[in-house]
UniProtKB/Swiss-Prot annotation:
Mg(2+) binds at D9, E58. Keywords: Cytoplasm, Fatty acid biosynthesis, Fatty acid metabolism, Lipid biosynthesis, Lipid metabolism, Magnesium, Metal-binding, Transferase. It comes from the Bacteria. GO terms for biological process: fatty acid biosynthetic process. NCBIfam families: acpS, pantethn_trn. It is an enzyme of class 2 (transferase). It is found in: Cytoplasm. This is Holo-[acyl-carrier-protein] synthase. Its cofactor is Mg(2+). It holds the Pfam family ACPS. Changing G5D: 5-fold reduction in catalytic activity. GO terms for cellular component: cytoplasm.
Amino acid sequence: MAILGLGTDIVEIARIEAVIARSGDRLARRVLSDNEWAIWKTHHQPVRFLAKRFAVKEAAAKAFGTGIRNGLAFNQFEVFNDELGKPRLRLWGEALKLAEKLGVANMHVTLADERHYACATVIIES
């Protein structure tokens, strides 16, 4: 196995809160997959939930070396937790096609948050 990419992102939670206050659920609709959307709608901390998902997806786009463009969208990267609570990534659409093209075999996600920030790192391996 070889490392194909590494991405890190940090999000100021207040910034996400301000966007939600200004534009309602538009950002959440653009960023979240259908499964994440269902969780977000009833989550006890929806702003923090969205900020963490946003950080992971930005980090993933950086790890893939593309950013969010050329057919890639935030909602094609889905963050979920495994049976131990560890954050994982599931890919859809163009993100999945890109992973297959690059020969991605493993994706590692780490996520941390404090009062004001959410931070994520994603490593992709062949």
